Amino acid sequence: MPAIFRTRLSRPVCLALTIVCCTASPLFAMDLLQAYQLALQNDRQLRAAQAQHDAGIEALPQAASRLYPSLGWSSSRLSVQQDRRDGATQFPLQRYPSQSDTLSLRQPLYSPHLEALKLQAASTALSSSATLQGEQQNLAVRVTEAYLTVLLAREREALIKSQIHSAQSRLEAAQKQFTAGVGIRTDIEEIRAQLDVLLAQALQAAQSISAAQADLSMLTSQAVTNFFVLDGNSFQSDKLRLGQELAPWLEMVLQRNHEVRYRQAQRDAAQASLDAANTEDWPNVDAMAQISRNSGENAYFVNSDTKSRTLGVQLNVPLYQGGWFSSRKRQALANLRESQDLLERAQLLAQNDAQKAYFAVHEGLARVAALQNAAASAQLVVTANQKSYRAGVRTTLDILAAEQRAAQVALDLAEARVQCLIAWVRVKALVAQADENSLRTLSSHLTPSE
């Protein structure tokens, strides 16, 4: 193969090809990973968070700029008209031009207040980054929930359609038996009643699919009607196991959880704000340099031209501003206490959420295993009722009841698998690990639709 064809495609190119294929072919089935990649590009909530992050991190260069040299230029061109009277003496009306040009340079030499404001801005920028990371993690959860909701709705519709087909077949058989004089009218009416309920459920299932697909399309900005499907043969419990120890996850969530990191940055910003308030009344020292030129400064020096150069150090010492400094310190201290309490609350909530999601995965896997056995048993009951019907021991209604129980168990099994997958990605999101690799793992539990 020529070398040019072995060149690895960049990620944007691969994503563009994915979108083109998804748009061009109505038979294209979008998997969970592809849905997440599209959502990363198109989700409005994430894009708004990105813009908010870009704006938030500008606080640091803005604060740092106040510690750099500031250079300014001012210039004026004036036309002065002076009418002067000294007692009874009237002086002639004077008209003369006045010009002024000044170039000033100022460099802070000692300003602990500005240094504290810079540290506060750095913490604010970190909180913006934590917020953006949190939105990325939440997007993975939202896409997973939306995608699996579509699959579950389609699974429910397929089971209902299967029940409808079976009920219609049983209804035809019951009608033939009644016509032949060996059936009873009650069986026909009961089957029809069950069929009406199933038809209503089918309509509701179709509406649920449309709503779920609309929710997913809002995230991906891509209308797709073909999806992967839930398949018991593809569901791999071993890939979802989180280990037997909860403690490592609780420790990890304190270090990596986006909400905890955001609150830590906010606490650090509040501490820096307190430092800034404490140093606001400290002396400041600036180096100054100035070059100026003036002409026509007043009526006595109409034709004068003055040039001056100034170089020196300026000391500013705030003395009293009506209690401003004390109030600022009290306010900053209260804000620090608030941020510390919010940090501790975020840590407790993150650990609590991680514990819930962790046990949801473990309990979900156990429930899936139990429902798999229940589904196999329910199918055996259906087969046994069918054999008993042929032997004349069971009725058509018995078969329908067994099939309904089997369908309900199958639906419960599908719901258990979906809940287990969602709980798993929530655990990953809580420790900032809900990325493309995690979504790829989830996609391996699904099967392309035929």
Short names for language-model regions:
Residues A3, M30, N138-M252, A357-A360, ...:
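Periplasmic alpha-helical coiled-coil/stalk elements that build and connect Gram-negative outer-membrane
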Residues R6, Q81, D412-E450:
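Acidic, low-complexity, intrinsically disordered peripheral segments
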Residues C14-A24:
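Bacterial N-terminal signal peptides
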Residues S25-A29:
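Sec/Tat signal peptide C-region and signal peptidase I cleavage site
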Residues Q37-R47, D54-P69, T102-Q120, A130-Q137, ...:
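A glycine-/polar-enriched beta->alpha junction
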Residues A39-L40, I188, Q222-Q290, N437-E450:
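Amphipathic alpha-helical coiled-coil scaffold segments and their short linker/junction regions
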Residues A48-A63, E135, L139-A158, S169, ...:
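Amphipathic alpha-helical coiled-coil segments
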Residues S74-Q107, D231-L242, D275, M288-R328, ...:
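Small/polar, glycine/serine/threonine/aspartate-rich low-complexity segments that form flexible
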